[in-house]
Amino acid sequence: MQNTPFRQIRALHDDEFVRVYQAYSDDIADKAVQANSFEAPRAAGIWSAERMTWIKPSAVWMAYRCGWSTMKDKKQALVLALDLSRARFQEMMMGARLAHGGESGKGTCKDAPVVVQWDPEREMFHEAEAKQVLTRGLTDVRSIQIGLRGPSVAMLLDPTFVLRITDVTEDFREAASKLAANDKTAAAAALWRHGAERPMELPAPLRAVLGMDVEAPPAAEVTGRVAVAADADVSTTEASATAAAPTSEAVAAGGKQQLPAGCATLLREAKQN
């Protein structure tokens, strides 16, 4: 990703929608896809708008988090692509708070409806060690992870916000199979069957909120432990159970980075998986 900005939202998108991913259990995913809405699993009592959830536009990051849908747990058995209204997505993101400082991070994360974490981007890599599940982290490019809670999670019930819900599990599994056979070209064709992830052009005020216009630290300063983003649906009670994983920028600073109030709690579930 030479000459790629340090922080950039890359997604399958057009003027009308932006695609993000999340992995779910079979029962939640099946009901959501069939109804094209999370109202069905909510009504069945298996999905809750009270639980914080993390979405991401990077397919490879999603593959890493869910182990290509086959290498982790049953709660991440199926991968869904959520096509969100672009206009409403950008409006929602204006209320975001940064998990790791920055201008917007000066507000508290404790009550923020949207929390943004910038983690090292990941790319497909067939020689990766087992825990990296056919991916590896990049030190010079960041990928956005978007945590939703409260009113932002409730927006997932709105059909004017979530335009389409598509089960893309088989795309992920086929990509993993091709990648394991060292056919990265075929793996990419499978993973991005519906189109490539492209940089999103965003208005300056939103870029400022998301802390996008920052320079990458010198290469020597980003060789620390790669951060682990927040995982699948998790309540804030569960999130407070374990210790947070610092970003590589925090490691470079000696691992003593002070997160905005409430943010450390939200990121503690990162080490559970």
Pin down the residues of each PLM region.
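Short helix/loop capping segments that flank catalytic or ligand/cofactor-binding pockets
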Residues: 29-32, 63-65, 92, 156-157
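Long, low-complexity, intrinsically disordered segments enriched in glycines and aromatic residues
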Residues: 87-187
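Intrinsic disorder/low-complexity signal
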Residues: 1, 232-252
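ADP-ribosyltransferase catalytic core
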Residues: 44-124
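Glycine-rich, aromatic-bearing surface loops/beta-hairpins
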Residues: 155-233, 251-273
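Residues that flank catalytic or metal-binding motifs in active/ligand-binding sites
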Residues: 17, 78, 142
